[in-house]
Amino acid sequence: MTHASNSHPVTELTKELIARPSVTPLDEGCQTLMAERLAAIGFNIEPMVFEDTTNMWARRGNEGPVFCFAGHTDVVPAGDLSRWHTPPFEPTIIDGYLYGRGAADMKGSLAAMIVATERFVAKHPNHPGSIAFLITSDEEGPFINGTTRVIDTLEARNEKITWALVGEPSSTLKLGDVVKNGRRGSLTANLTVKGIQGHVAYPHLADNPIHKAAPFLAELSQTHWDNGNEFFPPTSMQIANINGGTGASNVIPGTLEVMFNFRYSTEVTAEILIERVEALLTAHELDYDISWTFNGLPFLTGEGPLLDATRHAIRQITGYDTDPQTTGGTSDGRFIAPTGAKVLELGPVNATIHKVNECVKIDDLEQLALCYEVILEQLLC
């Protein structure tokens, strides 16, 4: 085992960012560090603070097309510190890997894009179009005051993004083997099924909402929503939480609360899913309240300049072809895509994200910066 230092510029900047314990929604100076680097190469820096969230819109150039790198400085909590090999906010290199919370998600990507942009601007100081950074500290949290608020601000002044590259850790086994060229939509239901509380010995004087809801939940879980298509897998519904009862064994509960989530393809809409669920509730003659939380539309970036440039970059730097996919969770790309921007995600291997001992291969950080630089050259040269 080695604990050698590493002088790669991407690694060094990643270490500086990891050392700032920016647990969501805190930024802890990460954006200030990035802003200093960007201002030095001609970027206009526009902080946007909404409530407890720190955001930054940085732009170099006044003309289109606009290439935007979107990312976040916040990280998830470290969890059980005793299970970490090294302190999560003390970046440490061990056997070619950089350990620390945020190494892969996504401070490595932030550092790689900063260094890539510095190199690109040094070579092409008069590049056409514009380069922008949209950075938030509210991606891992409730995502209320982050990217969505920045996009609202940009839309209000008709400032459009042409291409958005999101630095989420898209890779699976090796850097660049997978890019995300779309994401499924996300829709969450909070359902309350009403009954009548009573003593378990006198069921005729009560109305058990768990018993009433069980056939509905069985049918809900077995419903086939769609077949998906060539870009998206079939729509998935998963029950996430069920809560009913007082904790006592002799009390029939008065209500049952169920939370379930759809990850849906472009073959259906949120409205169709809501209509089908509520029709099912009615068919089972349930007394219920339901509220819906819309978390994002599905989006897809097909063939075109952004996907072409990314494929070319990965092939040139790594020597293999990437696989565009739409699987996985949501990202802040869902807030950017509705503006008409083409959105793609490319970042490090995601095997350790949100886990203890999160890490990234240091060679991947440098390769990621090279990929980002080639993408810039393909789009803005």
Curated annotation (Swiss-Prot):
Keyword Hydrolase: yes
Catalytic activity: N-succinyl-(2S,6S)-2,6-diaminopimelate + H2O = (2S,6S)-2,6-diaminopimelate + succinate
Listed cofactors: Zn(2+); Co(2+)
Cofactor note: Binds 2 Zn(2+) or Co(2+) ions per subunit.
Alphabetical keyword list: Amino-acid biosynthesis, Cobalt, Diaminopimelate biosynthesis, Hydrolase, Lysine biosynthesis, Metal-binding, Zinc
Alphabetical list of CDD domains matching this protein: M20_DapE_proteobac
GO molecular function: acetylornithine deacetylase activity; cobalt ion binding; succinyl-diaminopimelate desuccinylase activity; zinc ion binding
Binding site for Zn(2+) 2: 105, 140, 354
Annotated residues for binding of Zn(2+) 1: 72, 105, 168
GO annotation terms (biological process): diaminopimelate biosynthetic process; L-arginine biosynthetic process; lysine biosynthetic process via diaminopimelate
Xref: Pfam families: M20_dimer, Peptidase_M20
Domain of life: Bacteria
EC number(s) per entry: 3.5.1.18
Pathway per the UniProt entry: Amino-acid biosynthesis; L-lysine biosynthesis via DAP pathway; LL-2,6-diaminopimelate from (S)-tetrahydrodipicolinate (succinylase route): step 3/3
Active site positions: 74, 139
Family: Belongs to the peptidase M20A family. DapE subfamily.
UniProt cross-references to NCBIfam families, sorted A to Z: dapE_proteo (TIGR01246), PRK13009.1 (NF009557)
Role: Catalyzes the hydrolysis of N-succinyl-L,L-diaminopimelic acid (SDAP), forming succinate and LL-2,6-diaminopimelate (DAP), an intermediate involved in the bacterial biosynthesis of lysine and meso-diaminopimelic acid, an essential component of bacterial cell walls.
Subunit structure: Homodimer.
PANTHER family reported in the protein's UniProt record: ACETYLORNITHINE DEACETYLASE (PTHR43808), N-ACETYL-L-CITRULLINE DEACETYLASE (PTHR43808:SF31)
Name of the protein this chain belongs to: Succinyl-diaminopimelate desuccinylase
Organism listed in the record: Shewanella sp. (strain MR-4)
Phylogenetic lineage: Bacteria, Pseudomonadati, Pseudomonadota, Gammaproteobacteria, Alteromonadales
Gene: dapE
